[in-house]
């Protein structure tokens, strides 16, 4: 069989990536990435890295080339400041018309004059007898920039998600409700309540951006009480408004060197079992900080409770 050099080169450069996925978090100052590879039927967390957001496309191109990541499926997670999230009544229209109908309900609430792209995901429980949807609004220029940038870096863009959903991928599905407190370095605390793998409730807790600099004494003198009140309010809403069984467990992964002591303090103040989250995979390259949104994005299509740890 004869094959031209041009055809050979084309086939060579279209070979699939040896990596399973790459998760990218678009933060405020940095782009964080995690890479998953499947070897002998087991998923392995093989790389984690951070790049400056300034000229991020150039930096990402260089990293992809240096680490042979070309054509790897890529899942992008937007940091909390990159989008707006609204909860509204589900429009009473045909399924195919929902995406269009939601735009008119949230446009007046947008804080930016940019043209926006909208998407939504259904809320798993009715509130006050009404079905709800969570609407995500992202500026169109930002989406266009991401699509072009990922393509220029020679990655295969699979999904664009948000931090609340990406971090939800880190917890195995459970019939009991679990409240998670997750925080990226210098960010707000992201409070989620999950049940059976579904996100029932999400809040952003402000005022904890400098959590790493707070001492245990500062928490004991009042900050811990404030945080426990926010937790209790969220659990009360989950039970009373969403009519769900009580939360059974709290999981934390916070940006603080005293995380173990803080977890114990939360346990004492809420009278709830509290544990520090075990990451679903062990990194090949240990790092003092982990981008949870980036890791969760990389695990988007992996059942962590049954496959990832095998």
Tell me the role of every PLM-derived stretch.
Residues 1-310:
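Hydrophobic/aromatic-enriched cytosolic interaction surfaces used to assemble or bind macromolecules
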């Amino acid at each position: 069989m004869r094959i031209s050099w041009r055809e050979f080169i084309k086939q060579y450069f279209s070979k699939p990536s040896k990596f399973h996925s790459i998760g990218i978090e678009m933060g405020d100052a940095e782009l964080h990435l995690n890479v998953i590879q499947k070897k002998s039927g087991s998923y392995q967390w093989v790389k984690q890295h951070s790049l400056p957001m300034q000229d991020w496309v150039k930096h990402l191109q260089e990293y992809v080339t240096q680490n042979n990541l070309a054509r790897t499926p890529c899942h992008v997670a937007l940091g909390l400041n990159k989008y707006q999230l609204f909860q509204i009544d589900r429009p009473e229209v045909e399924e195919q018309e929902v995406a269009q109908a939601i735009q008119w309900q949230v446009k007046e609430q947008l804080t930016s004059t940019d043209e926006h792209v909208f998407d939504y995901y259904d809320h798993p429980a009715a509130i006050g007898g009404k079905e709800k949807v969570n609407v995500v609004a992202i500026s169109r220029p930002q989406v266009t920039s991401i699509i072009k940038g990922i393509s220029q870096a020679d990655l295969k863009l699979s999904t664009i998600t948000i931090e609340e959903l990406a971090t939800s991928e880190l917890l195995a599905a459970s019939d009991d409700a679990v409240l998670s407190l997750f925080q990226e370095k210098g960010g707000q605390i992201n409070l989620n309540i999950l049940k059976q793998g579904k996100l029932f409730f999400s809040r952003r807790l402000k005022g904890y951006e400098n959590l790493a600099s707070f001492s245990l004494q500062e928490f004991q003198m009042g900050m811990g009480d404030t945080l426990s009140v926010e937790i209790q309010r969220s659990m009360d809403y989950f039970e009373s408004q969403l009519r769900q069984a009580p939360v059974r467990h709290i999981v934390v992964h916070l940006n603080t060197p005293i995380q173990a002591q803080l977890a114990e303090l939360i346990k004492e103040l809420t009278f709830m079992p509290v544990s520090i989250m075990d990451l679903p995979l062990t990194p090949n390259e240990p790092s003092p900080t982990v981008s949870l949104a980036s890791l969760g994005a990389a695990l988007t299509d992996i059942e962590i409770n049954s496959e990832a740890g095998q």
